[in-house]
Amino acid sequence: MKDHLIIFDTTLRDGEQSPGASMTREEKVRIARQLERMRVDVIEAGFPAASNGDFEAVKAVAAAIKGSTICGLARAIEGDIRRAGEALRGANSARIHTFIATSPIHMEKKLRMSPDQVVEQAVKAVKFARQYTDDVEFSPEDAGRSDITFLCRVLEAVIDAGAGTVNIPDTVGYTMPQQFGELIRTLRERIPNSDKVIFSVHCHNDLGLAVANSLSAVMNGARQVECTVNGLGERAGNASLEEVVMAVRTRQDFFPCDTRIDSVHIVPASKLVSGITGFPVQPNKAIVGANAFAHESGIHQDGVLKHRETYEIMRAEDVGWGANKLLLGKHSGRNAFRSRLAELGIELESEETLNATFMRFKELADKKHDIFDEDLHALVSDDAAALQEHYKLLSLTAHSETGETPHASIVIGEEGRESRAESDGSGPVDATFRAIEKILNSGVELQLYSVNAITSGTDSQGEVTVRLQKSGRIVNGNGADTDIVVASAKAYLSALNKLHSKLERAHPQV
């Protein structure tokens, strides 16, 4: 029987550190439920000590998820670990992931601690974490630049202290695959008690090698890979969950292990994360890109038509690609609507939320003849965003005519008050944004504006992503509507609502 390769997803923690990718508590729970359906082994839900928002998000995920282990990150200090333990109290299966830097430069310049003090602190942290859960993971931050002998000493000590998993991060994405594989093999050979622990890896993609390094580590004995959906993460991102899983699954002739991932949920997870974060997936992205299974060359097309395996090494349907399934229309009832949401893995928290979302569906069905699965995902995302609204779009009129200056008139609700403004602009979207700013005077800088059609057809909903920056903070906002100008206003206000509600948090470099 092959070894089990544990998939540790950190989309909700490390993935959220992408500039602009901040998620609300409800959004984190939605993604966590999709990861649970995918049968992800461990979900790192956040860094509870970073902020009250992070604490509550980890607590909510821990309460909602029963089929995956829920993990909270903590520095190797008692306050962080206590906070993580409290956030995870409601979890069916909980893990605390604690870390401390072990490289000479970090110990000297950042921690101002001697090597002996670092070992002592790491051991204390693991023992303290064991008071909250038997499942403790330890990471030596900046392992790639750490002295190998000292690294072995630290890891041996934390294993003796009760760590069940030791995670080796390539924090700055500098290591080559052969080097990283050799590092894992060396640690397993030199640490006397290495047989009592699972070796994990956490690779960053600064040189485009995160997946390659992770797979090299697996070939050298690592049995947990830390990764994110779509490779999301700060700088160039993390190892991509879908690429790691499908590389191991497709090359079972090569790898001595396999995951328990239900791969048909990969594409839905990719779309969900992309929609919530506002980070589109590049068309040529392996596994989940729109062109991943497209064949332009006539020779390739002919081969695929005759025998799929000529140019396809895996089946599109095995990762969740399927026909754009026609779903519902204006005559569809509430039960059919609820049933289709359940099939898509969308769970609404209450009957009240279901009723409100169904009414929005009926409004959309009046504008759009055919409703597809993608429309429902966008609809639910819009409704989830509405729950966090401080600023609410009440009405919008935009006018654009050839040879005339575009004009917009808008009404925004804020804590029960209504504010109105009008503005001209270089286009209807520009006029709308200017009108919003006349009311709110937010002082933000628009960094990104993008539009994507959710489905095909001239009556398709447009999904707009807006990225705003203010005082060094970056947020993304999304909006969907059959009217692009309305979708743009929704996206702009969505981003402003995130700026209004989100607090700054400390982001660890693990």
From Swiss-Prot:
InterPro entries tied to this protein: 2-IPM_HCS-like, 2-isopropylmalate_synth_dimer, AIPM/Hcit_synth_CS, Aldolase_TIM, LeuA/HCS_post-cat, LeuA_allosteric_dom_sf, LeuA_bact_synth, PYR_CT
EC class (word): transferase
Pyruvate carboxyltransferase domain ranges (all copies): 5-267
Sorted UniProt keywords: Amino-acid biosynthesis, Branched-chain amino acid biosynthesis, Cytoplasm, Leucine biosynthesis, Manganese, Metal-binding, Transferase
A Pfam family assignment: HCS_D2
PANTHER family: 2-ISOPROPYLMALATE SYNTHASE 1, CHLOROPLASTIC-RELATED, HOMOCITRATE SYNTHASE-RELATED
Assembly mode: Homodimer.
Protein name: 2-isopropylmalate synthase
Organism from which the protein derives: Nitrosospira multiformis (strain ATCC 25196 / NCIMB 11849 / C 71)
Originating gene: leuA
